Amino acid sequence: MGESAGEPRHVASPDLYAESFSAAVDYLGTKAKHVNREQISVIGISGGAGFALSAAAVDTRIKSVVTISMYDMTDIREMANLAPEQLFQLKDQLSRQRWDDFENGQPDYHPSFPEEPYDSIDDLPNHDELTNEWLRFYALKRGFHPNARGTATTTSNLAMLEFSALDYIKEISPRPILFIYRNANQRLNYRMLIGILVLNVF
């Protein structure tokens, strides 16, 4: 992740994604002298929003969180709606991919966004609803960046299966959280609604 050196590139690491928010707070609280340490908030967009909440659950220096179109990338089980045997098959496939990666001398990668942005929404290829939504932002000039093309090692999904960004969301309370969604049912799963309820009750 990021632009640091080392191989393999594009490893999706949920703990490091969350750590990035705390690292930003480190910087703001030590290097940005005009910043009040007691008034630092974070904003998480799309997949980053879940990790912003994960960071805030343990980093009390984060005084509030704003999420925009939050997407919990660690909730593979919920997103894929897999039966137990399908979940086992997925884990087995990903686990064995680690051997393949080692023997091939390089990791297998998820498909990525295009190398150049599309000119308009009409030019975008048609995929499933979730991929279409991503492409409408990240594959167009407004959201495209050459270093953020959605590529990750295939085995990164193992880390997403063993880490849950929202497990400790209730520990953020009483610090405020603002959830911004385009519409009322956009990716709000049961676990997310319970988290909101807990925060509002307590």
Residue ranges and their predicted role:
Residues 2-41:
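Catalytic nucleophile-loop/oxyanion-hole region of alpha/beta-hydrolase
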Residues 41-44, 66-68:
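Short beta-strand immediately N-terminal to the catalytic nucleophile in serine-hydrolase-like folds
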Residues 44-48, 52:
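Gly/Ala-rich beta-loop-alpha elbow adjacent to hydrolase catalytic centers
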Residues 51-136:
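Alpha/beta-hydrolase-fold enzymes
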Residues 140-161:
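Hydrophobic, aromatic-rich cap/lid helix
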Residues 164, 181, 185-192:
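Conserved alpha/beta-hydrolase "acid-adjacent" motif
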Residues 172-173, 178-181:
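Short beta-strand/loop motif that positions the catalytic acidic residue
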Residues 198-202:
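Catalytic histidine neighborhood in serine/cysteine hydrolases
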